[in-house]
């Protein structure tokens, strides 16, 4: 059961929480008539400390331990054929990913913007990674495995700003040094690189009933035990027009406006050299209408589908 306590002695702030779980999972492989047990007890604490420097400035220190569990398709060993030469399948022995993170930040805010730069360290145990192997002759098989560990040391920034009560901006760049250890998978040397990403979101109100939204995401190259994922970029746009005395709304959205969203993977290991580009039909134009029969609710941001 989660447990929370908080206290604010003077200009200091304190908040703590703890959550415990004890899953007892029995996975049955029917075709092999085999039971795979996965039973464990884990505790996930969270700690937040703050020191108020002034009405607009604050120092923060945070620690958390989190879990990311594998999804069904990552566990399902039934093969999925992307084409006759490439097979993907889940790994029923895949363990949950455990994440320890510590970050220190400085928050500065007023009526027009808030700024939160920070430094952080993140340690992942049993991190998920895709491994591609030669199955037979020229047929490849890809499945999920657990890394020994994945470490990141970096800096990030969260900027929120409002301009003339018409334009809201959110900008979150992130840069870090990443090191992965896949020695448990037979890859002896640790691999490391610098990488970065950035998210940009904006909402522009035009007149009393029109809102335009733009959001974009960029990620630089990221490591895998066998190579790397190459950089990716996506831009989405949308418009919402309120009608019928604000009881109704017309929505027009465009996901992946410039058709740049794709997953490019480059593998370069002693046993395999490969470059794969996966591209779905990600440019989706959506036109919709909604009508509220009851009390007017707070308008939500537009939704975009950037799944690959």
Give each language-model segment a name.
Residues 9, 20-26, 63-69, 78-79, ...:
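Transmembrane beta-strands of outer-membrane beta-barrel pores
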Residues 1-32, 40-46, 55-100, 121-141, 166-177, 199-221, 257-271:
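Surface-exposed extracellular loop regions of Gram-negative outer-membrane beta-barrel proteins
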Residues 3-7, 20, 47-51, 104-108, ...:
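Residues on the lipid-exposed face of transmembrane beta-strands in outer-membrane beta-barrel proteins
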Residues 243-308:
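C-terminal beta-signal and adjacent terminal beta-strands/loops
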Residues 11-14, 56-59, 112-115, 165-169, ...:
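Repeated loop/turn-to-beta-strand initiation elements of outer-membrane beta-barrel proteins
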Residues 1-2, 95, 108-110, 114-172, ...:
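Outer membrane beta-barrel strand-and-loop segments of large Gram-negative receptors
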């Amino acid at each position: 059961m989660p447990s929370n306590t908080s206290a604010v002695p003077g200009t200091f702030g304190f908040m703590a929480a703890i959550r415990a779980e004890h899953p007892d999972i029995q996975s049955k492989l029917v075709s092999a008539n085999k039971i795979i047990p996965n039973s464990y007890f884990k505790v996930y604490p969270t700690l937040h400390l703050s020191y108020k420097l002034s009405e607009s400035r604050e120092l923060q220190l945070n620690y958390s331990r989190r879990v990311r569990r594998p999804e069904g398709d990552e566990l399902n060993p039934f093969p999925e054929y992307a084409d006759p030469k490439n097979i993907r399948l889940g790994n029923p022995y895949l363990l949950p990913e455990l994440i320890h993170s510590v970050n220190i930040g400085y928050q500065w805010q007023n009526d027009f913007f808030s700024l939160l730069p920070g430094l952080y360290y993140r340690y992942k145990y049993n991190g998920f990674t895709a491994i591609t192997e030669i199955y037979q002759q020229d047929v490849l098989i890809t499945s999920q495995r657990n890394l020994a560990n994945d470490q990141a040391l970096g800096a990030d920034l969260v900027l929120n700003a409002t301009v003339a009560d018409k334009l809201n901006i959110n900008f979150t760049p992130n840069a870090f040094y990443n090191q992965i250890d896949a020695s448990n998978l037979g890859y002896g040397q640790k691999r490391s690189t610098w990488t970065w990403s950035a998210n940009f979101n904006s909402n522009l109100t035009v007149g009393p009933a029109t809102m335009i939204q733009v959001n974009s995401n960029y990620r630089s190259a990221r490591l895998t035990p066998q190579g790397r994922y190459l950089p990716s970029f996506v831009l989405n746009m949308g418009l919402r027009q309120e009608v019928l005395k604000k009881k109704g709304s017309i929505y027009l959205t465009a996901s992946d406006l410039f058709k740049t969203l794709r997953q490019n993977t480059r593998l370069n290991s002693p046993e395999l050299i490969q470059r794969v580009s996966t591209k779905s039909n990600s440019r989706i134009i959506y036109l919709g209408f909604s009508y509220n029969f009851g009390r007017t609710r707070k308008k939500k941001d537009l939704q975009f589908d950037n799944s690959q």
